[in-house]
């Protein structure tokens, strides 16, 4: 998270939140107002504590819901037109990196960097939400608060990860805590101008509240740029491994431990790939190779700023882990997502050696996230994605082992299909004809593009174009996707998706070369202000924010075919909201 660089540079950020370290961490509020902006959210009451509830308990009286800051939310709160309907967003405040993704006891926990009282990155906490299907989320109380030191100076819980200490290697749990509930959070204790150190917290109530370890920090190398620990279990070495960023030294350090408390350095993977200003939010996983019984290790590194499109991006390396070192297969830099708005991706921890590799990314960019024109919240997460590896053609002579991403469980949200067409070509009356979408509703589209090469093919004209217009009366706002067969290029244009709001770094249009070795499949998830595009069954992905004028949402989609290009097997399907209030 770029905030870390700002704070480490000594720039003071003003926060509205006073010390919360002494306050109980599981509280209800006394009442709620009609919420129009973040400052109207009712303060948390210090007078009434609530015992840890069972799963599915966060519906408050009179049809309201519980927010991420323990506030009651009025019915219809999540229906605001500037809020995505199927992507997780905080009830209020500012959210960035996903943290501590862990699956245990049939429940997916997702923690996240959270500034609950401001709409810009500030006094970071660990927010918390849970799901049984990676689609529908319930808000839980804040898991980790800042620590207050002398003279009111705060140290902040920066990004990290979570594990299930099934065998109680840490000794933090009693026999009364069942193994599946022994969740340990590993995070960076960021003390501005002093140090970044790794610390842990643990739960004794199944993951509802957390207590900081009294012996923190568990790893301190006397550095101001040492953060974002990802801890995994090495099944071959039978020990814990921490992957942590030595951010401005461009290093990813590996440490081992048998108890999550005492750590020994193993190696450093350094100065590889795209550098940017700094490394952040590393991760590593053993990923299956499609069509085989083989696995390869993948090392993820976020960089910011310094992305090819500017700002934030996540790169990865394919290789092997020998228990001490990560050894890449090649020096090729690969990017997880080629859009403008994907950063700080995190992977789910599971106690199973052969569990699916599942991850989530922060759908924003530090170049403009603090100015995004949303009213009571800022930022969203991508839908959960399953990762595999596949040999993907790069040109007629070379394949490259590449990450394949598949969105998970979106099918649970599908409504009745709105539109189907077996083919749309340039001579079809359907080419360019608008399809009206339900108001304030997410939707998906699925299409295969093909080209008749017997016809002339000219760059800029031999293409298929998908246009998503807003529902404002004049259709002045839109976002579009072009597949140009002559140029072997995919173009995303969001120049008309920032009306009423302007940021010079909000790249209006960008193109990416794609090697077209046959038909091109496109699967898109379009939510209020967010597009996730998956090309050729996840060989490439593009995550992009867009901002229509306040009150406007996607209202039409059209498929325009030019010069020998055809859209085949076209479907458009609305998606039901994930929220019940």
From Swiss-Prot:
Carbohydrate-modified residues: 37, 40, 46, 57, 62, 79, 168, 175, 322, 399, 409, 425, 446, 452, 519, 569
The organism of origin for this protein: Schizosaccharomyces pombe (strain 972 / ATCC 24843) (Fission yeast)
InterPro entries, sorted: ConA-like_dom_sf (IPR013320), Glyco_hydro_32 (IPR001362), Glyco_hydro_32_AS (IPR018053), Glyco_hydro_32_C (IPR013189), Glyco_hydro_32_N (IPR013148), Glyco_hydro_beta-prop_sf (IPR023296)
Gene3D superfamilies to which the protein is assigned, alphabetical: Exo-inulinase, domain 1 (2.60.120.560), Glycosyl hydrolase domain, family 43 (2.115.10.20)
One Gene Ontology cellular component annotation held by this UniProt entry: cytoplasm
The keyword Glycoprotein appears for this protein: yes
Annotated substrate binding sites: 94-97, 113, 158-159, 227-228, 280, 366
Name recorded for this polypeptide: Invertase
GO terms for biological process, alphabetical: sucrose catabolic process
Entry comment on modification after translation: Glycosylated; contains 67% carbohydrates. This is composed of equimolar amounts of mannose and galactose. There is also a small amount of glucosamine present.
Family, similarity comment: Belongs to the glycosyl hydrolase 32 family.
Keyword field contains Hydrolase: yes
Leader sequence segment: 1-22
Entry-linked PANTHER family: EXOINULINASE INUD (AFU_ORTHOLOGUE AFUA_5G00480), INVERTASE 2
Pfam families recorded: Glyco_hydro_32C (PF08244), Glyco_hydro_32N (PF00251)
Enzyme kind, highest EC tier: hydrolase
Keywords: Glycoprotein, Glycosidase, Hydrolase, Signal
Gene Ontology MF, one: sucrose alpha-glucosidase activity
């Amino acid at each position: 998270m770029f905030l870390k660089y700002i704070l480490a540079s000594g720039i003071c950020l003003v926060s509205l939140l006073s010390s919360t370290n002494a306050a109980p961490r599981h509280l209800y509020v006394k009442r709620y107002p009609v919420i129009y902006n973040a400052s109207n959210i009712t303060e948390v009451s210090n007078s009434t504590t609530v015992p840890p509830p069972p799963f599915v308990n966060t519906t408050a009286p009179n049809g309201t819901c519980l927010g991420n800051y323990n506030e009651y939310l009025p019915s219809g709160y999540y229906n605001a037109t500037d809020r995505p309907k199927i992507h997780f967003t905080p009830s209020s405040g500012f959210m960035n990196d996903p943290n501590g993704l862990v699956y245990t006891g049939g429940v997916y926990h997702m923690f996240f960097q959270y500034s609950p009282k401001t709409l810009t990155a500030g006094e970071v906490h660990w927010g918390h939400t849970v799901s049984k299907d990676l689609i529908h989320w319930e808000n839980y109380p804040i898991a980790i608060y800042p620590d207050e030191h002398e003279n009111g100076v705060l140290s902040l819980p920066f990004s990290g990860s979570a594990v299930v200490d099934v065998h109680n290697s840490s000794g933090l749990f009693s026999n009364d805590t069942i193994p599946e509930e022994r969740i340990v959070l590993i995070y960076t204790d960021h003390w501005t101008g002093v140090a970044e150190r790794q610390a842990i917290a643990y739960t004794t109530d199944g993951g509802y509240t957390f207590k900081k370890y009294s012996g923190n920090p568990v790893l301190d190398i006397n550095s101001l740029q040492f953060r974002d620990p990802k801890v995994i279990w090495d099944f071959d070495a039978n020990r814990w491994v921490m992957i942590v960023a030595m951010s401005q030294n461009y290093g990813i350090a590996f440490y081992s431990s048998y108890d999550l408390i005492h750590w020994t350095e193993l190696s450093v993977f350094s100065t590889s790939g795209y550098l940017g200003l700094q490394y952040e939010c590393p991760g590593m996983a053993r990923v299956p190779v499609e069509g085989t019984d083989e696995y390869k290790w993948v090392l993820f590194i976020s960089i910011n700023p310094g992305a090819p499109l500017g700002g934030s991006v996540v790169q990865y390396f394919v290789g092997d882990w020998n228990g001490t070192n990560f050894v890449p297969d090649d020096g090729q830099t690969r990017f997880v997502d080629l859009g403008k708005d994907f950063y700080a991706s995190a992977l789910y921890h599971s106690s199973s050696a052969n569990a699916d590799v599942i991850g989530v990314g922060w759908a924003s960019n530090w170049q403009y996230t603090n100015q995004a024109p949303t009213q009571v919240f800022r930022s969203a997460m991508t839908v959960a994605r399953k990762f595999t590896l596949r040999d993907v053609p790069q040109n007629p002579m070379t394949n490259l082992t590449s990450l394949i991403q598949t969105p998970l469980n979106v099918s649970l949200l599908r409504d009745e299909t709105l539109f189907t067409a077996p083919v749309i070509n340039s001579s079809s009356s359907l080419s360019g004809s608008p399809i009206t979408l339900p108001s304030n509703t997410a939707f998906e589209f699925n299409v295969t593009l093909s080209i008749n090469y017997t016809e002339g093919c000219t760059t800029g004209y031999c293409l298929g174009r998908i246009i998503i217009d807003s529902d404002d009366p004049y259709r002045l706002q839109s976002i579009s996707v072009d597949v140009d067969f002559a140029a072997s290029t995919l173009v995303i244009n969001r120049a008309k998706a920032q009306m009423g709001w302007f940021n010079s770094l909000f790249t209006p249009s960008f193109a990416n070369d794609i090697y077209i070795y046959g038909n091109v499949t496109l699967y898109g998830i379009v939510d209020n202000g967010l597009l996730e595009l998956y090309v050729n069954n996840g060989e490439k992905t593009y995550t992009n924010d867009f901002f229509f004028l306040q009150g406007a949402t996607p209202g039409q989609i059209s498929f325009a075919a030019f010069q020998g290009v055809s859209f085949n097997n076209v479907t458009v399907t609305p998606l039901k909201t994930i929220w019940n209030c």
